[in-house]
Every structure is written in structure tokens, then in C-alpha cells.
Amino acid sequence: MKFDTRTVLWSLLKYIGSGIVIMWLMFWYLSGSFWGLPRLFVAYYAASQVFMTPVSKATLYDGMLKGLIGSLGEPHSVYLDADEFKSMKMQTSGTYAGVGMVLGHDDKGLYAVSIMEDQPAFKAGIKPGDHIIAIDGQSTSDITVEDASSRIRGEAGTVVALDIERNGETLHFDITRESIVLPTVKSKMLTSTVGYIRISQFAENTADDFETQFKELQSQGMKALVLDLRDNPGGLLSTTEKISNYIMPPGTLVTVQNRAGKKDVYKSNGPEVAMPLVVLVNKGSASASEIIAGAIQDRKLGTILGTNTYGKGTVQTIYPSLDNEGVKVTIAKYHTPNDRVIDGIGIKPDVELDLPKGVNPSSTIDDIQIKKALELLQH
């Protein structure tokens, strides 16, 4: 069989040309620019072949993915690598190894939104509002909340070094990580008729724990409730909805509105007559905590007491990708029953009262907010 070299070469050129045209059109569509493909090639060549030190292809590709989601300019939308994705799943399950601290980001950088009671960070003396300037000697100036959380978590028994800035002073902490199974619900009777429930996070198991402890307090004579959501960073909307069924009569809990304007209304379905209620909040109360507080305030079901909340009024979902990675992306904003959007604003309490510095929330001896809640419920 005789091959015509020119015919073979021409066929190859047609296939290659067709491939280039398809790629060019694809990147034109993806980038919105006719020059999308060459722009990518120039950037990739500069990073992989010209940059002063060699960089792996995997690092460059991960950077592209993180940059893609980061370009949304919304702090809660991030591409999660394998470690970050694992950390996220552990956080919502309520079980992980770390120091028991929830992080956030403000105009000064990375900071502690809330410190979980009786966990390593709490015992070491880290306080809500502390800015974390270094983790294991590495600056936090250019890392995301998810990156920082992943670095702080690790094997139980290992030590993480944190450099903290507090009121202009730099402090150093060496904290031993522990396996943390979060007791997300704690309760007790404050008086013969007033119960107290503290929720530290709305995790997968929180609703069941809340139900058990709520019914136990009822059996002890609870007729009114102090619900403590201070330093609660939020969690699962499904858990929030279940808990609302114990403290709110039938009605709107929250409305979630997506980019297309579609509205999903979540409702509470509790007793027709609500139990007298005071909800404690502070700057560390975010997301699901604000859903509860906002609904109670709008529907006049109780009194919100404390300081202005964090102001996270958005809903995220996680899309798993291959290789145990994923994308956490903000899909909607939530509206309180009176159609308030609190993202970036927070909820202003009905009764504003701050804790003195150095007082741990839920300490009934020194906690003036709990004392004020009791005063409100007993009048």
C-alpha cells in the first residue's frame, strides 16, 4: 500500500487546525474575549517556564481553580482542595481534631470569630476578636479562612503555634490539638421556672441534642427560656429549621432568594403559644444564629439581648468535584420574615448590653447578660 505523504500531512494539519479552532472558540466563550486562548497560554508559559523558581503543574492548576472562584469577590465562595474539603466536612459533622476556634476575615485580616467553650483555644486564653497574624511561623496576610482552618487543624496531640495581635500587643500561643467532638448543646435550669440552653454550632447532631435537653428542662418545670447563641458561627439550615419547631409558633422562619429571584420559604411549626424567650447574641453570632434571632425579633416572639451580630446573611452550598475536592459557593441571600437583608449589617438587639472584658459567656456568676435576661423574663 502506497502512502501519499502530502495527503497524510494535509489530513494531520486539518485535524490539528480543527482542534485549535475548537479550543479557540471554547476559550472565546469561556473568557468572553476573542483572545482568551492566547492569554491563557502566555500566562501559563510565564508561570511555568519564566518564573524564577520551578512550580509544579498541579500547583499552577490549583491556583487557576482558586483564582476562578476567588474572582467572584465574595469571601464565602472558595475552591476547596482535598485538605480544605475534608476540613469542611468535619466541621459540619461536629467532629474533628483541632483547637476549637471559628475564624473570620475583616479589614484587618484573619481573626477569631468565636472560641468554643472548654476546647484547647479557650483553655489557652484565645479570645473572640483576636487577630491571628501567623500560624506555625507563617504569615496569614495572604491566606483564606479555609486555608487557615486547614493549617490549624491536624493530628490530635500535635502542637500548632499561633501569633495573636490583641489591642496592639502581639502574643504567642503554643496549643496542643485535641480530638474535638463538639457538645453543641448545653443546658441547665437558671431558676425553678427559667431554663437555659446554649448552642455553640448548628451541626448535624445539634437538633437531636436540643430536643433531648429541651424536653428534659420542661420536665424540670421550665416555663421560660434563655437561648444563648453568642459566639455561634452558624451551621446547617436544616438543623436551624428543626430547632425552630420547639421555640416558634407556625410561621415564616426565613426566606432564601437566589440569583434568579426564586424564593424558598422555610417555616417554623412549633406550639401555637410561644414560651417566653430571651435570645443572647454578640459579634460572633452569625448565619444560622442570625436566622433564629431575626425571626424571633421580626415576629415579636421574644427579646434579643446583647450586641450587634456578625452580619452573614448568605447561604452556601458545596459541590464535590473529583479527587476529593470541591467548590463552596454562595447561592443566595436570606431575608428575615419582615424582608430584612442583614448581610454585612447584622441584627441590632432589642436590648443592647455588652459583657465586660474578660468575662466568659454563660458564666452565671459574672454574666450580666444572663442576669439581664432573667430580669426581663421575671417581669
Map each language-model feature to its residues.
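Cleft-lining beta-strand/loop regions that shape enzyme active-site pockets
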Residues: D4, M26-W28, G32, Y111-S114, ...
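PDZ/PDZ-like groove recognition
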Residues: L65, G98, V102-M116, T193-R198, ...
